[in-house]
Amino acid sequence: MNTAPIRPAAIDRDADGTPRSREHGDIYHPRGGALAQARHVFLDGDALAARWRGRERFVVLETGFGLGNNFLATWAAWRDDPQRCNRLHFLSIESAPPTRADIATVEREAPLQPLATALADRWPPCTWNLHRLAFDDGAVELVLAFGDVAAWLAQLIASVDAFFLDGFAPARNPAMWDARLFKAMARLAAPGASVSTWTAARAVREGLRAAGFDVALAPGANGKRDITRATFAPRFTPRPTSRRAASSAVRTQRASDDGDAVVIVGAGLAGCALAAALATSGRRVVLIERGTEVAGEASGNAAGLFHGVVHAADGRHARFHRAAAFAAHDAVARACARHGVPGSTDGLLRLEPDADADANSLQSLVDALGVPADYVRALTAEAASALAGVTLAAPAWHYAHGGWVDPRALARSWLADAGSTVELRLGCDVDALRRVGDRWVLLDTDGTTLVAATTVVLCNGSGAFDRSNGTPWPVRRQRGQVSSVAATDLDPKAVPRLPITGSGYVLPAIDGRVWFGATSQWGGDDGAVRTDDHRENLDRLGRLIVAAEAPPLDRVTGRTSWRWVSDDRLPIIGAVPAASTESLGLGPSPSTRLDQPRFVARAPGLFVCAALGSRGIASAALGARILAAAITGAPSVVEADLIDAVDPARFLSRQFRRSEAARNREASSAVQPPEAGSPGAA
């Protein structure tokens, strides 16, 4: 996906105060008012009140978010309707997004003003991501995509009930109205999906017809004669031949909503985050944990960090970890506010490890990528030191959405949010997983059935990679040790005000102790705290903070744990490939293609979220969103190529492609004619 820099909207005001796009020379809404147009063209045009009545969810996709008036009007109508759907999903794409100040200061009609204030408070940085903003306890979900409309349409995974086409006039903004728009709409449309738009341009009507929509003109408003309305009614049932259609069909294993609970194995960060996400979607959960407490193993450190990534290529790794950092920020901010969880979302500093780098080179990278200052800033060592309250050895990145949190408290807060919809079973060790009929049966070490369900999610770290379960994913086990010391045993000038990372990390004082680290060694089973590892961590601390004098070793304590890391350093999140499940009684994979993950058949109702590596907090928060959408059938709040990047089937596909390439090379060499002068040459 090409992530070219995003230009925020340049908005002028006409003499009467109507906002106007400087780029397109067009007004954002008619002078008769934004709310009147939203109601007449979109809410009435798509018959929202009648169509969402009594439904579990309703999905709207808008092209052209503008200043958010259509979303705000839809949200207000949903709130005022006692027969509304349980959940409203509103997806919107905007190539030139407004700023937070634009959202906050634009004049609104009275019914929309309090909602606009809530929207401005949650407004995200202008980055290439799907930004999820949840309102009304998660019942209303706004998903914003900033950047090229055609590029984003190709990345969406959703079944859309109503389309709002609200870009600037086709003559002024043709890129938003080309054939790619209508083709993507046909792919995303649910049966009977509706379309409304204020324009009656012939090219728009013809494009909709060619894509399988029945099109009609309707009376306009605010002095406009006609508007366009349409209904998806293709002559033939679309086949999932496109890349994204195939991807969605094979990997979205929507669980039957027959009252059967979703079973999650593992009550660490990943399992608890998913339990909360499913509870928000109205699903019951049975959460099984072999230990005697929640988040007692790899998730059991006193504190953990979350932050984004800056990389010149802005590839899948950088974009995934950026999205994960945003998800973690939202989760931690909520947990701190609602449950008093120890943590902070006030930012984080990451020292640049490149000895040749300076603040100017860091800023040049920020400028080239076009990332905004409310996501990341490049700071000199002096500026970073002033922010941290300690003397730092190098220039740094300041991630405004970074921070730290107590992982155990965060996990418990997720379960508190889920409430009675989650049944927690501690001390249950899942020894085997078997397929019996159309259900998964989980057995303990005595062969006794613990639970049976149609949908199971493996979030149990090492247990998810038990090869007896047929999971040939390349992962390695990594031991890590963190160290801590009483804040009074350190020079006050060595205790930072906010988290610092780089060659290691150090956190602010938490309950009177400063945590820092961490070592990493592959393999091994030694869980004892090692003095040599404390020395290594103290050395890391000294490389982060200038003149951080080491305390006596006998005053340092610590903790060890293990984490799983995949070969490509990305987590493993999604539906388990059927090609991995022969030992579970499913037989050989029915898949006829293995070259791309999207074509690999999946084990019905079996998912995994594991190998979260060193970014467990952030990856757990985002992984929960990915899996909740896949299980419930809700729109994905993560773009398709990032779902590709963490797909459990990616390793099978890579192995298959390597084998095919080797076979092709062998076949090519076998038919190669002998060189002149060699035996057998003519």
Positions of predicted regions on the chain:
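The AdoMet/dcAdoMet-binding core of the Class I SAM-like
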Residues: 51-160, 179
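Helix-loop-beta segment of a Rossmann-like dinucleotide-binding subdomain
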Residues: 114-115, 312-315, 340-350, 375-416, ...
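A short glycine-rich, Lys/Arg-flanked "PGG" loop and its adjoining helix->strand segment in the class I
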Residues: 178-191
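Short beta-strand to alpha-helix junction loop
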Residues: 196, 313-324, 354-358, 397-416, ...
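Active-site substrate-recognition segment that forms the wall
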Residues: 238-257, 263-265, 269-281, 290, ...
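Dinucleotide-binding Rossmann-like beta1-alpha1 core, especially the glycine-rich loop
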Residues: 304-387
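Helical element adjacent to the flavin cofactor pocket in flavoenzyme catalytic cores
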Residues: 397-446, 450-451, 455, 459-460
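C-terminal catalytic lobe of FAD-dependent flavoproteins
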Residues: 551-682
